[in-house]
């Protein structure tokens, strides 16, 4: 991997472990992209961002990134992908970036919940008036540098690492990195050891 971006993230900081930590809680953060038209071939949409669903198990030792599900889907399929991830991982919290795309997907997600009788709350994630670069650096750089992020191996690894090592680069997508950075707003873990 070449760090063609700002070289904010270094290859030596990347750790892999396929073994799920025994302790911790799951969190899911979603960065929505624009939606494809139903039945669209996607040829003209090649340069659109992906919707990205980051699934992380957090504990006092850091974040274990189970997977990042990503792709370009219509709004119904996006809602189904989110629902399937929540059903599989049973997270403590689910968050979707605030905005028009969130408003578009919520009725479909609510409909799936009603039909399946499986309900969960969806938190609204906000960028807090921070520029994306600042927000991503704040939530991820120190964690990676200090070994507090471990990646599960999966097909998503190459796309994620490409985006991470080239961040920030206007010519490269950053949706997988962005969704992972939003975990910061959901994962409330105490890093303080028990003192006698």
Model-derived segments and their meaning:
Residues 117-136:
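Conserved phosphate-binding/catalytic loops in two-lobed NTP-binding clefts
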Residues 1-123, 149-196:
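RNase H-like, metal-dependent nuclease domains and their acidic two-metal-ion catalytic environment used
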Residues 134-146, 164-167:
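Short, surface-exposed amphipathic charged segments that create phosphate/polyanion-binding patches used
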